[in-house]
Amino acid sequence: MNTAASIVCLGSWNTRIFTPSWVSEKVFSMSEGESMEIGLNEQQLNLFYKWKGIILLMLDNRLEFRSDNCSHESLSMMELFYQRLSELLPYTPVIGVGFNINLTLTHEEYAGTSICGLIERRNLDIYSNNSQTFSAEKDGAFRSFVIQMNADNVEIRANFHYSDPKKVPTVGTTFSIIEKELKHFLGYEFSLC
């Protein structure tokens, strides 16, 4: 099983604030002597910062923390960075916050879930999009689960979107809630990391 995670904050971000020194000191709280990777997002021509496996990508209307190699440490760090940013920039108009988990399961792993009959592995050579979306609103979040099957694997995307950032659970719990909901939804015991 492969896992990736992200926190997406929609709002009116002043990306000029996000200088390398400000990000390293205020957001990442890096110690002296530590360094971070600075790169260019070629699609949007914006800078991104990467430290300890966490990528901070800034666009005018969206800010994203992303980890492609999910671990309990990276999930906790992303939530902590999101909280710091909320405290550092309290007057930034934020219109929504999304917590996302993307799982990639083998067909054998997917067969062990209680929902495997919802999308069957058939006609994959004919049809390119065998997917199903499930969604509901609960505890201030719009929750959606998307299951997409292809010839190689099964992708499951979980998104918890809060249109009111004040309803986001306390730091350190949001990804735990998503993991618990995914286990319940899939009927499958696993660890995100």
Which residues does each PLM region occupy?
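Mixed-charge, glycine-accented linear interaction segment located at domain edges/termini
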Residues: 140-193
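Karyopherin-beta/Importin-beta family HEAT-repeat alpha-solenoid scaffold
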Residues: 35, 43-45, 118-124, 176-177
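Aromatic/basic-lined ligand-recognition segments
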Residues: 17, 108-162
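N-terminal low-complexity, intrinsically disordered segments
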Residues: 1-67
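Hydrophobic, Leu/Ile/Phe/Ala-enriched alpha-helical segments that form helix-helix packing faces
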Residues: 27, 31, 81-89, 182-190
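Glycine-rich, often proline-containing surface loops adjacent to acidic residues and nearby aromatics
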Residues: 55-70, 92-102, 152-163
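Charged surface patches that recognize polyanionic ligands
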Residues: 70-129
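Short, conserved charged micro-motifs
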Residues: 16-21, 73-77, 109-111, 166-173
